[in-house]
Amino acid sequence: MEEPYFSTTNTTDPTTRLAFEMRKTEYEFWVNQVPELDSDFELVTQSLYRTTGVNEGRIVHILMALHRLEELPELQALQHRLYHLDLDRIIAINKSLNRLGNPTPEVVARIDEQLTAYLTPTRPNQTMRTQAQIKRKLNELINLADDTLAGTQGPTQ
């Protein structure tokens, strides 16, 4: 029986292989640009703008999203295995998770586990999830997290 994979990671299709290499190369380039937390973020983004020509706003979104991915070890490990998420999907994940504020480690771990399961292929040549689908799934997970938090905080006065 054939292993599950996303259509965007199909190793038998030459176009898909090239697109995979582009995603992987771009991802690895930006991962290597993520600054240390004590770095001057504005200087880093300005320098990257000058050297890459990428809009500073996009650079900020990319770096913040990759920093967030470090907080999701299961999803990050899957990404390092499949390179199935392009930067726009990773940015969408970060933007959605920003709604959580400062969640507990348990909430982050639960979202990491469930999001990773959602973004793991379950059948051969499965269509890759769209940004909209990923956002909807994250909204469900965030709403569940909010309900859990509301249930543990007690009534408001």
Task: Name the predicted role of every residue range.
Residues 1-157:
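Conserved C-terminal region and hinge/linker of Rieske [2Fe-2S] proteins, especially
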